[in-house]
Amino acid sequence: MLALIRGAGDIASGAAMRLWRCGIDVVMTDLARPTAIRRTVAFSDAIVHGETMVEGLRAVRAENAAEAKKLLREGSLPVLADPECACREELAPDALVDAILAKRNLGTKIDDAPIVVGVGPGFTAGEDCHAVVETMRGHTLGRVIYSGSALPNTNIPGLIGGFAGERVLRAPCDGIFTAVHRIGDTVEEGETIGFVEGQPMKCTISGVLRGVLDDGVPVKKGMKSGDVDPRCKPEYCTTISDKALAVGGGVVEAVLYLSAKAQGRR
């Protein structure tokens, strides 16, 4: 079985890891200049650096579908700079997972593959996909919805260590981002993490810098550009999060259940 995942940020990468460990081949696509924050646990980093490793799984940039197939045979997870997912026709996946997390559907259709799964708000099971996986922290995180939609976006990050919106760092203006600190650094409230066109982006809480944009990424004012973890555990920076694992588990359930159902086994 082959699963094609649109998006290769940390949540999408959690889904990719769980599918891969269940014996399902995975190919991922993302922007040519990815905007993932938690880059140490996002397979999108392979697009920028050629390859990356997350929890022992090696991801490698592929230039086209043929190269992606070759990398799969070699045991690596291919990642393509292909935001429109044009590789879908040649790859002909058994399942397509839209994990872009745009809070809206950017073009995924229910007939894109035999199994189509939408991650988070913006999708409706039975209309533009076969199943939706909940991404809102709380009782329903990771739950698979086979009819209807995920909870609407609140624009308020989930609580971690007692903090919600305060832990997210946002660009102070439009421009090009340049980091001062690196992922895993211990930072203090009020400390400058990076600059956009000379304007500082400062921490609002103390903790460990769990995520930050790569140097040279174009940003818009207010765009999420960093993430401080108040739990102060640097090891969390290099391991897939509880949320990504929960969402990933929901993706695995959806893919396997819908596959079994199509075969008359459920």
Where are these regions (language model features)?
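Well-ordered secondary-structure scaffolds
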Residues: 1-266
